[in-house]
Amino acid sequence: GLVEAHRASGAACTLLAGTSDVALPYGRVLRRPDGSFDRVVEERDCTDEQRAIRELNVGIYCFESRLLVPALGRLTCDNAQHEYYLTDVPAILRDDFGGKIEIYTADLGEQIIGVNTPEQLELTERYLRERGE
């Protein structure tokens, strides 16, 4: 799984990503031309072109703990929501600390559901009722 892949890779960060044919309110994983990690762009900050990307950041990470706190200290709130995004940490680890960033891709299915709005909460509750949970 994710933790085992992270440990084996020696990466500064391994992030969980998944694909979906449905437009979900998750950040998009952007890759460089060679397929390596570029950055995560939060859904609200995406361009229309980025919003069409179906590789999604699930928001679950493994970090090299000794690098995490210094990287958090370099976060800024220069984005549409004026928030500090944990999603910026992988790029900071790569760019400022020379850390390797890995992407662990998994089938999302309906196993991971984000709830950021009342509408998403309603959809999640309906899904769980239909499953009998």
Task: Give names to the regions the model predicted.
Residues 113:
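Conserved acidic, metal-coordinating active-site core of Asp-based
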Residues 1-34, 58, 62-65, 70-75:
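Conserved beta-loop-beta/alpha segment of the NTase-like Rossmann-fold superfamily
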Residues 38-110, 119-132:
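Catalytic-core segments of class I nucleotidyltransferases/pyrophosphorylases
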Residues 1-4, 129-133:
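Short, intrinsically disordered, charge-balanced linker/junction segments flanking boundaries
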